[in-house]
């Protein structure tokens, strides 16, 4: 009972839904509204349908048949010998892999997530751009990295940095939906002030993000200017 469908499937992607959106969807299936709350709670803990023991088997089978529930699968795990840092390779439903990093500090835990499979930005110092951009990640695939890392380490995640594979502002809609999902009080409840969005400098995306009214930290990579020739290099910020 996996609930996974081929990438691009028309089946609703339930991990990309807010709790209220999930409530509406579950009610549309003829099920009780409170079942959505139970399901949402399980998904935020990274549980598979077989682990959702307080939900009827018939309900789980129905959702697995009708919906797309995408979880990140740990394909590889690399643990630091110096501290509690763990680097993950997560396999997505279509076989693409993305990287995430779990970091633990005195003040809490942070996960660095990817926003795309591959990258189109062409920064020569970054290996992520070698094969170009394969595709954007869905909100659920970005959120799933945070959930999977927390589940694997048995830790609450306190912060997020969007500094993995891909350019978050080149996948704007998924990035913004992810930010709303990961900061939701009904979900992982990670404060927006504990989230950093890294960009190589997509100005229209920066302006749009500022207009969203979400107090995330914006990190601009100045390394992307290294290979710009001197005559065309912008003035220092």
Segments from the language model and where they lie:
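Flexible, acidic/Gly-rich N-terminal and inter-domain linker regions that tether
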Residues: 1-109
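Short amphipathic alpha-helical interaction patches enriched in hydrophobic/aromatic residues
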Residues: 26, 43-47, 127-130, 164, ...
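Short amphipathic alpha-helical segments with coiled-coil-like heptad repeat character
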Residues: 47-51, 205, 236
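Phosphate-coordinating loops and pocket residues in cytosolic domains that bind phosphorylated ligands
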Residues: 54, 211, 230
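Conserved Radical SAM active-site core
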Residues: 96-216
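Short, acidic/turn-prone active-site loops that include or flank metal/cofactor-
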Residues: 117, 223-224
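Single conserved hydrophobic/aromatic residue that forms the stacking wall/gate
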Residues: 226-237
């Amino acid at each position: 009972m996996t609930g996974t469908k081929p990438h691009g499937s028309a089946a609703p992607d339930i991990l990309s839904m807010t709790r209220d959106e999930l409530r509406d969807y579950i009610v549309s299936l003829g099920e009780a509204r409170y079942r959505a709350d139970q399901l949402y709670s399980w998904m935020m803990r990274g549980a598979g349908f077989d682990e959702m023991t307080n939900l009827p088997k018939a309900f789980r089978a129905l959702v697995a048949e009708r919906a797309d529930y995408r979880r990140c699968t740990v394909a590889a795990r690399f643990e630091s010998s110096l501290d509690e840092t763990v680097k993950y390779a997560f396999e997505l439903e279509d076989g693409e892999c993305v990287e995430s990093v779990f970091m633990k500090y005195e003040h809490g835990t942070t996960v660095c997530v990817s926003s795309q499979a591959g990258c189109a930005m062409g920064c020569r110092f970054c290996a992520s751009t070698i094969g170009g951009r394969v595709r954007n990640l869905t909100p659920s695939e970005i959120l799933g990295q945070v959930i999977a890392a927390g589940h694997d380490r048995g830790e609450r995640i306190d912060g997020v940095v969007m500094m993995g594979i891909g350019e978050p502002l080149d996948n704007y809609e998924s990035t913004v939906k992810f930010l709303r999902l990961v900061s939701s009080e009904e979900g992982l409840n990670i404060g927006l002030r504990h989230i950093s969005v890294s960009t190589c400098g997509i100005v229209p995306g920066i302006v749009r993000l500022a207009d969203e009214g979400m107090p995330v930290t914006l990190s601009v990579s100045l390394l992307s200017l290294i290979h710009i020739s001197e005559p065309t290099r912008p003035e220092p910020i």
